[in-house]
């Protein structure tokens, strides 16, 4: 379990980056159909929050690497290393999103160009998420090299992205877009998280090395998972029931904490064939 806590910078990076990409996807769709100029101005202003969270995530990843220069050195292996591909894809996504926001907030972004720019950025974001997931599919780590890792990572994109975008977009008084389906999509996502977590809990006893059982790495798996699901259930209730900005902000925080708990468990399950790290 100690491994999960030691990897807190990666917990922050993965959860925040995934949530930011998920929110960008929602913003991209909303802006494609939003014609009201004042509404679009509002959307572009709150888009900064997405970039800020993404920036915090990248700062956390640099903390994990130790020195910023190591991130640049990692780019030398783009194409041959998934970690290098992850850094490159993330940097491109951040750059495209940042320049789009800057040009749009200055009022210099044509609508047609903006639509294309956001879609291209969204596609790069999806690639970023795919590569981030692939980084952890390591043959020698049986607890990570399975479909549950993909489900876990992509569901964070869904949950974090939906909550963040809903909290940012619903206060817009000039909006012409509708967001009534987002709470339902979030509830479906929570249900899938519960299914994945329960399945993983039962499956842990079947994964072991010569000296370690995977279940022993996360002795608090049950209580942490229950806590995570309770937090996500509270968020689902808030999304369905309230429009208060403060409570919606709390829903974002609770979602990030809940997914952070899930990610701590994920890193705590680091186990290689023949040896273990954690416990």
Swiss-Prot record:
GO terms (BP aspect): anaerobic electron transport chain; anaerobic respiration
Transmembrane segments: 10-30, 46-66, 87-107, 119-139, 151-171, 182-202, 220-240, 245-265
Keyword Transmembrane helix: yes
Disulfide bonds: none
Segments in the Cytoplasmic topological domain: 31-45, 108-118, 172-181, 241-244
Resulting phenotype, residue 276 to A: In strain: Eagan
Spans within the Periplasmic topological domain: 1-9, 67-86, 140-150, 203-219, 266-279
Family, per entry: Belongs to the DmsC family.
Function description: Terminal reductase during anaerobic growth on various sulfoxide and N-oxide compounds. DmsC anchors the DmsAB dimer to the membrane and stabilizes it.
The protein's name in its UniProt record: Anaerobic dimethyl sulfoxide reductase chain C
